[in-house]
């Protein structure tokens, strides 16, 4: 019997009607939606409409911005993507750049959330655009995200970087890009054309150029681009600030938990070459052994499977360490004309607007990756001996005297053996040395040289966090709030966290709009003051109202940024004096031995008889 609600049903009409319904309800309807069809310089794109809690957004995912850097293009600067025929499907993320995958805690959410969620490939130079639906009638500010991951990992497709929430809630255009990491992005044989180094940074720059050329098509304003990133992404943002060819491609900058002057962020040309040639040797290049030139070495490296390079890249580090990474940007005299410290000190930053900040416990995340006595599966109550050994891996370049100074500064001398205090001290050593104090130093220098700077410390531990309580608020765990993930009900954040995320998104969007995180429409709320070299004001970000403080870990950063460099300089002088003294003593000893031998020889000769 025919259902009463289907009077026209016949077998001959069933299939066409079903296809028509699928077309109207599925991809066909979106294919005809003018909001989801755009034309960029490379050709046409078809995007997808996604739902956020507040409404829909348009997403254009997996847009190629460079030719695939495969085969003979491995290690070379990127080439702009050539035009394509027809309409390119941009409804799903593309491959993740080849990289190391973290297997320390298999299946654990705290590590898996940072692992690649798409297929690994060297064909990976794609970007993504989220824009309000419908597109803004007038040009809207653009936020461009650079992911972190120690320059050895990361992907723009990770769930934590989902741009739909920020684009919908704040009406901004959000862009993210993949860039090459590890040896593929940062292996360098300085002076060679085959592997010049810093090609991962050049990938980012090419994506920024793509934004300038195309973002207006999506409703974005190419004259109001804010570059933001976290950890190695923040260091990358800083390097673009310091590299003149990049400076004209964006207008404001946000550096979250990273800075270009961090001790892990760059290497010199000599160390870069040492690491490159060591990796080559580890994978059997050049085939004839030592003595080959750069061209032969790179030609050989290009024949090696990508996974071979990944499997060996950690073996090139000069010593056991935490918060050090194998292939990072090189001070090449080109992208970086000098060290970041020198460029920061010499730069003119008048008119620049910068937002910088850190989280409460920057060091804790890294301790489970090599500091003695630390694990996510226990309380990590370490002994004094483990703390002393931890300082050597936490500050791997330190001389004996410098390491003693670190121990002296971070020991609670009323409780020098207390395991909980030692655990906290070890976290502070790694966090202050690598993140907090480089960020504070950068903020002070930029402010002193004309930039308008805002600074924060993020202090809220998410209710959903899977890492143990002793780790506090770890590195990277402000990102989910900046991107608005607590707005998604299925993720089970609290109501207070949803409000907090909305507040943070508003701060970041306000900064992208005006260069000031404060909301001019609501002057009654606590104001976020600029950071100056004198007052050093910053704010704490947590569930409570904004709190203004002064001096971001000022005592610790005076140690790292002022005292320790002077100590190292003095000990370098002492070491050189000792070397010269030993050399002189050796020459004097040799002379005395020679003199004694001559004297003994003379003494054994027959003496003249008395006349």
Swiss-Prot record:
Molecular function GO terms recorded: acetylcholinesterase activity
Domain of life: Eukaryota
Signal peptide: 1-31
Record's subcellular location: Synapse; Secreted; Cell membrane
Entry GO CC: extracellular space; plasma membrane; side of membrane; synapse
PROSITE patterns xrefs: CARBOXYLESTERASE_B_1, CARBOXYLESTERASE_B_2
Residues carrying a glycan: 293, 378, 492
S-S bonds: 97-124, 285-300, 437-557
Catalytic residues (UniProt): 231, 362, 475
SUPFAM superfamilies, A to Z: alpha/beta-Hydrolases
GO biological process terms on file: acetylcholine catabolic process; choline metabolic process
EC number: 3.1.1.7
Membrane topology summary: Peripheral membrane protein
Subunit structure: Interacts with PRIMA1. The interaction with PRIMA1 is required to anchor it to the basal lamina of cells and organize into tetramers. Isoform H generates GPI-anchored dimers; disulfide linked. Isoform T generates multiple structures, ranging from monomers and dimers to collagen-tailed and hydrophobic-tailed forms, in which catalytic tetramers are associated with anchoring proteins that attach them to the basal lamina or to cell membranes.
Functional note: Terminates signal transduction at the neuromuscular junction by rapid hydrolysis of the acetylcholine released into the synaptic cleft.
Family membership noted in the UniProt record: Belongs to the type-B carboxylesterase/lipase family.
Protein name: Acetylcholinesterase
Organism: Felis catus (Cat)
């Amino acid at each position: 019997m025919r259902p009463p609600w289907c009077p026209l049903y016949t077998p001959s009409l069933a299939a066409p009607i079903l296809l028509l319904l699928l077309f109207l309800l599925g991809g066909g309807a979106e294919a005809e939606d003018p909001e989801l069809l755009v034309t960029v310089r490379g050709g046409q794109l078809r995007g997808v409409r996604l739902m956020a809690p507040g409404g829909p957004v348009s997403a254009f995912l997996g847009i190629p911005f460079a030719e695939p850097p495969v085969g003979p293009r491995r290690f070379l600067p990127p080439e702009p993507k050539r035009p394509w025929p027809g309409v390119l499907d941009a409804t799903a993320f593309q491959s993740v750049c080849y990289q190391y995958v973290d297997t320390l805690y298999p299946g654990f959410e705290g590590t898996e959330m940072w692992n690649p969620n798409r297929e690994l490939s060297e064909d990976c130079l794609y970007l993504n655009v989220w824009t309000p639906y419908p597109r803004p009638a007038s040009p809207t500010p653009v936020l461009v995200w650079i992911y972190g991951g120690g320059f050895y990992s990361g992907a723009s497709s990770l769930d934590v970087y989902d741009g739909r929430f920020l684009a919908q809630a704040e009406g901004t255009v959000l862009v993210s890009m993949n860039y090459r990491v590890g040896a593929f992005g940062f292996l360098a044989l300085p002076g060679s054309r085959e592997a010049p180094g810093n090609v991962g940074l050049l990938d980012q720059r090419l994506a920024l150029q793509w934004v300038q050329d195309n973002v207006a098509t999506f409703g974005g304003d190419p004259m109001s681009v804010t570059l933001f990133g976290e950890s190695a992404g923040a260091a990358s943002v800083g390097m673009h600030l310091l590299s003149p060819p990049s400076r004209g491609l964006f207008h404001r900058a946000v550096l979250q938990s990273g800075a270009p002057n961090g001790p892990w962020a760059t290497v010199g040309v000599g160390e870069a070459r040492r690491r490159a040639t060591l990796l080559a040797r580890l994978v059997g290049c050049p085939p004839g052994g030592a003595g080959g030139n750069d061209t032969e070495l790179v030609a050989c490296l290009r024949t090696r499977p990508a996974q071979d390079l990944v499997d060996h890249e950690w073996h090139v580090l000069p010593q056991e360490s935490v918060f050090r990474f194998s292939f990072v940007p090189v001070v090449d005299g080109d992208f970086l004309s000098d060290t970041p410290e020198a460029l920061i000190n010499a730069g003119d930053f008048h008119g620049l607007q910068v937002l910088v900040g850190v989280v409460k416990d920057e060091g804790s995340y890294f301790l489970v990756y090599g500091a003695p006595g630390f694990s996510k599966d226990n309380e990590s109550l370490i002994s004094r001996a483990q703390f002393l050994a931890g300082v050597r891996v936490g500050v791997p370049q330190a001389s004996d005297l410098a390491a003693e100074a670190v121990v002296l500064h971070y020991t609670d001398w009323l409780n020098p053996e207390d395991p909980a205090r030692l655990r906290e001290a070890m976290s502070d050593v790694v966090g202050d040395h690598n993140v907090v104090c480089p960020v504070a130093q950068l903020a002070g220098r930029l402010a002193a040289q004309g930039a308008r700077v805002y600074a924060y410390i993020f202090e809220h531990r998410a209710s959903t966090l899977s890492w143990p309580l002793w780790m506090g608020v770890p590195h990277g765990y402000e990102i989910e709030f900046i991107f608005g993930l607590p707005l998604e009900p299925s993720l089970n954040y609290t109501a207070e966290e949803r409000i907090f995320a909305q507040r943070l998104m508003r701060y970041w969007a306000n900064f992208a709009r005006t260069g000031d995180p404060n909301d001019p429409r609501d002057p009654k709320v606590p104001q976020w003051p600029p950071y100056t070299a004198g007052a050093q004001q910053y704010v704490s970000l947590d569930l409570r109202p904004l709190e203004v403080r002064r001096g971001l870990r000022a005592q610790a950063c005076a140690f790292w940024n002022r005292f320790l460099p002077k100590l190292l300089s003095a000990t370098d002088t002492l070491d050189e004096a000792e070397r010269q003294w030993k050399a002189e003593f050796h020459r004097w000893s040799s002379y005395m031995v020679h003199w004694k031998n001559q004297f003994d020889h003379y003494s054994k000769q027959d003496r003249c008889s008395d006349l």
